[in-house]
């Protein structure tokens, strides 16, 4: 039996978000729908989830002592990481002391960097992956590239949104690729992964829920990447029944090996009927924002339902749908959005994240659309995103 308290009352059920970006904001909203008290934590003030939380704190989440202090102050029943850059050793300590880390502290530690999850998938679970090598110096990086061959991809073992990634075609790129990888890591300079390029027809995110009533799968989400970050996503991605069966089997093995209740974003390469594991996030995935319009329960609602110990039951997918990011480039601490009236309509929505500032290129919103076909939904979402004029 799941007992939920009422926010701001002595018996409140308290959820602490570690990371308060646009994904955390939607998790906070879903918690609010259930009367759950929300505490939003991030490294900067006025982050999106802080706008809809009961309280907020600004700390360096890589500082274990600072993390412990805010947890001891707020006494959350659930600690919900939204990002990778967190003091995961402290999360393990806190879990050992009886706190509930979502989905579990081991999952957050293993997926905090690409090495932990790659070794779990390829070496422990024996799942198909790309060829890979790890390196923690420029000389070892060059050896790894020579081993893997061209073309290949280098990524910091800990980064997000494509930061620090380079697609390497020749030796002339190596010095710059190493330098860029060292600048792009979430926790500063350090270790990298060099991956062989996988031949694939398309990439998917298989949003997979581990809940009290078993493992559930959303329809596969297709997406287009540019500069390591997603630009559009759509659902459902068409694939063969055999490929879908293999994708679900890989996702099931990964989430059960990681453990705990919650939603996982399992990234996979698909080539005909073959499926290759890429990465996994033990939390809602940015490409899954399409589920805000495509499903009866969004990925955020599913995450909250699962970690609170509630049954999922089933997931209803409404048909062809897409998301397209609103990604302006400017510098401002007072952003405004014009022409919004032309970005919304029947079966057409937008989400503006409320990020407090922009310096360069930053994802500030997303357009969401449904249509008779995935192709039409993508075009509708892209057109809507293009209608929003960001000023500052």
UniProtKB/Swiss-Prot annotation:
Keywords: ATP-binding, Ligase, Magnesium, Metal-binding, Nucleotide-binding, Purine biosynthesis. The keyword Lipid metabolism does not apply. GO terms for biological process: 'de novo' IMP biosynthetic process. SUPFAM superfamilies: Glutathione synthetase ATP-binding domain-like, PreATP-grasp domain, Rudiment single hybrid motif. It is an enzyme of class 6 (ligase). One of its GO terms (molecular function) is ATP binding. ATP binds at residues 114, 155, 160-165, 195-198, 203. Mg(2+) binds at residues 267, 279. Homodimer. This is Formate-dependent phosphoribosylglycinamide formyltransferase. The gene is purT.
């Amino acid at each position: 039996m799941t007992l939920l308290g009422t926010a701001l009352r002595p018996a409140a059920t308290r959820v602490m978000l570690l990371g308060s970006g646009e994904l955390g904001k939607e998790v906070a909203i879903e918690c609010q729908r259930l009367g759950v008290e929300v505490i939003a934590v991030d490294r900067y003030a006025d982050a999106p989830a802080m706008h809809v939380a009961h309280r907020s704190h600004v700390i360096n989440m890589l500082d274990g002592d600072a993390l412990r202090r805010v947890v001891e102050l707020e006494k959350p029943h659930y600690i919900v990481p939204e990002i990778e850059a967190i003091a995961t050793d402290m999360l393990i300590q806190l879990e050992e002391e009886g706190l509930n880390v979502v989905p579990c502290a081991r999952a957050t530690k293993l997926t905090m960097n690409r090495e932990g999850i790659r070794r779990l998938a390829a070496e422990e679970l024996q799942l198909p992956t790309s060829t890979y090598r790890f390196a923690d110096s420029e000389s070892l990086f060059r050896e790894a590239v020579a081993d893997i061959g061209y073309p290949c991809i280098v990524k910091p073992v800990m980064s997000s949104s494509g930061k620090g990634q380079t697609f390497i075609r020749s030796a002339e790129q190596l010095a710059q690729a190493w330098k860029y990888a060292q600048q792009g890591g979430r926790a500063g300079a350090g270790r990298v992964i060099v991956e062989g390029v996988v031949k694939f027809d398309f990439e998917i995110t298989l949003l997979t829920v581990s809940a009290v009533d078993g493992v559930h799968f959303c329809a596969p989400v297709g997406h287009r990447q540019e500069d390591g970050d997603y630009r559009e996503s759509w659902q459902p991605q068409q694939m063969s029944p055999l490929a879908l069966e293999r994708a679900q089997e890989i996702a099931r093995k990964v989430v059960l090996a990681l453990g705990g209740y919650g939603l996982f974003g399992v990234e996979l390469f698909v080539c005909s009927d073959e499926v290759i594991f890429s990465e996994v996030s033990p939390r809602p995935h940015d490409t899954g924002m399409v589920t805000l319009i495509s499903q009866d329960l969004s990925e955020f609602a599913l995450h909250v339902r699962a970690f609170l110990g509630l049954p999922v039951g089933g997931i209803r997918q409404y048909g062809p749908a897409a998301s397209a990011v609103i990604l302006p480039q400017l510098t401002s601490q007072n952003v405004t959005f014009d022409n919004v009236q032309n970005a919304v309509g029947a079966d057409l929505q937008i989400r503006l994240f409320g990020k407090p500032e922009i310096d360069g290129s930053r994802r500030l919103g997303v357009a969401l659309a449904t249509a008779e076909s995935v192709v039409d939904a993508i075009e509708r979402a892209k057109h809507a995103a293009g209608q929003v004029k960001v000023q500052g």
